[in-house]
Amino acid sequence: MSSIGTGYDLSASTFSPDGRVFQVEYAMKAVENSSTAIGIRCKDGVVFGVEKLVLSKLYEEGSNKRLFNVDRHVGMAVAGLLADARSLADIAREEASNFRSNFGYNIPLKHLADRVAMYVHAYTLYSAVRPFGCSFMLGSYSVNDGAQLYMIDPSGVSYGYWGCAIGKARQAAKTEIEKLQMKEMTCRDVVKEVAKIIYIVHDEVKDKAFELELSWVGELTKGRHEIVPKDVREEAEKYAKESLKEEDESDDDNM
């Protein structure tokens, strides 16, 4: 069967003869062309890191963020089309707010992930709409449930993870994440490793400038999702650059 759409890619409600929905695959392609985002769950929380590419020197520092607060206890990291991601962040916030209004307590992350995944999936069923061109991770921490991390892709499937990467360098990032002993690490340890992984997978040839965005939610923040403090972020970036330099020197010695 041909891998080219040839008419079967005009609508998200049409299957190709070999059982593929091309519009959903194209949406996933938009995620694969985006900057890398990673999320790591550890014993006392969840840490997010995003490689936010700076496409112009004229951009104001800190603009076009790819990390969002969904609720006090839930954070979100995105890859793909930023406008689509913002729309889904608003949907997730609405779900969390409605749940608290109805039941009087914070929404469990699995329930939130399932609800938003159902919404994303609905946009793959009709010809009048297009799939969302973004993937995103949701992370939270509570005393009862501990740390939790979920990823939702453009097809509307929700996965639970210990460590996850989305975006153009996801495979390289996953390889680095697999080397970590996540169940034994704390958020403070993981922040450094997240920064290091983002620096390792960043392609300096194609994408020169980038901003590192870091956030965490865990015991350290009393269950609130917060941007990593500036001094901790700078320390993590310093560790990442030094580790990268050491690896380059060891490679030169081995040649």
Swiss-Prot record:
UniProt record similarity statement: Belongs to the peptidase T1A family.
Residue numbers carrying N6-acetyllysine: K57, K206, K230
Sorted UniProt keywords: Acetylation, Cytoplasm, Nucleus, Phosphoprotein, Proteasome
Tissue distribution: Ubiquitous.
GO biological process, one term: proteasome-mediated ubiquitin-dependent protein catabolic process
Function per UniProt: Component of the 20S core proteasome complex involved in the proteolytic degradation of most intracellular proteins. This complex plays numerous essential roles within the cell by associating with different regulatory particles. Associated with two 19S regulatory particles, forms the 26S proteasome and thus participates in the ATP-dependent degradation of ubiquitinated proteins.
Oligomeric form and interacting partners: The 26S proteasome consists of a 20S proteasome core and two 19S regulatory subunits. The 20S proteasome core is a barrel-shaped complex made of 28 subunits that are arranged in four stacked rings. The two outer rings are each formed by seven alpha subunits, and the two inner rings are formed by seven beta subunits. The proteolytic activity is exerted by three beta-subunits PSMB5, PSMB6 and PSMB7. Interacts with AURKB. Interacts with CDKN1A. Interacts with MDM2 and RB1. Interacts with the C-terminus of TBXA2R isoform 2. Interacts with DNAJB2.
MF annotations from Gene Ontology: ubiquitin protein ligase binding
GO cellular component: cytoplasm; nucleus; proteasome complex; proteasome core complex; proteasome core complex, alpha-subunit complex
Modified residue annotations for Phosphoserine: S243, S250
The keyword Lyase belongs to this UniProt entry's keyword annotation: no
InterPro entries found in the cross-reference section: Ntn_hydrolases_N (IPR029055), Proteasome_alpha (IPR050115), Proteasome_alpha-type (IPR023332), Proteasome_asu_N (IPR000426), Proteasome_sua/b (IPR001353)
Residues the record lists as N-acetylserine modifications: S2
Subcellular location: Cytoplasm; Nucleus
Main localization of the protein described in the UniProt heading: cytoplasm
Protein's recorded name: Proteasome subunit alpha type-3
